Amino acid sequence: MVLQYPQNKILVLSDHPHNFSKTQFLQDLFHCSSTGISIVKDQTWENRYYKVHFDLYIDSCKDIPVWVEEFITPECEPLRNVMAGIILITDIRQTKPQELLHQFMIAAHRNTFVVLVNVNEEVEQDEIDELNEIWSNAFTNVIEFVNWKRSKPTVNHNDYGEKLGLDRIQEIIDTHDWLNCEVLPATKIREEIPNEMPLEQIIRNLQSARLKYKSIENSSEADAFANEMADELSRYL
């Protein structure tokens, strides 16, 4: 897929009542303390399969639905096209995301992930799960609701071993189809694979390996990488 612009930006937006939550969120997820500026250049996201350089856009607004109305205008199309991901920090019971997501997602680039981070501590995980069920097949984009409680740690997985909270957001970024990532050598990947591995880790590794495989343009190199990773992961299956 050829894009007119490089998709190497992640936008983190909060409405004004939750600016403090955004500050801690940026520190916890991106280890970013430069919250007083709107653009933090050349950040690095790295896992065992690849690393990618991106710019972190930080913003706040009085009202997210009003911000969305401006964001989906034709004038903002160049901005939308460079967004690898958009993270909205809000109270989902106040924002009513079901109403704004329809128009928002029609305008968003199809390779942009969207995460709505709920900071209302009265919202239970069952309510988040229900929203994710509704939106899971609505668009081709990754759209996910995540509970994040600043005052107390969020349980990082459910009864099925699926990631929750910040761990789930990290997983979304890890498995995003980055178009400008630097693939790490297969030898380094093999060195980092432990002797024992839980099933959920195997699944994450398969997802990341798929991303690397798709980024290798030479078919022979891609096939060689696939065979190497199949051999490595077969030890744990």
Curated annotation (Swiss-Prot):
Involved in gross chromosomal rearrangements (GCRs) and telomere healing. It comes from Saccharomyces cerevisiae (strain RM11-1a) (Baker's yeast). Keywords: Chromosomal rearrangement. It comes from the Eukaryota. The keyword Transferase does not apply. InterPro entries: Irc6. The lineage of its organism: Eukaryota, Fungi, Dikarya, Ascomycota, Saccharomycotina. GO terms for molecular function: protein-macromolecule adaptor activity. The gene is IRC6. Belongs to the IRC6 family. This is Increased recombination centers protein 6. The keyword Transcription does not apply.
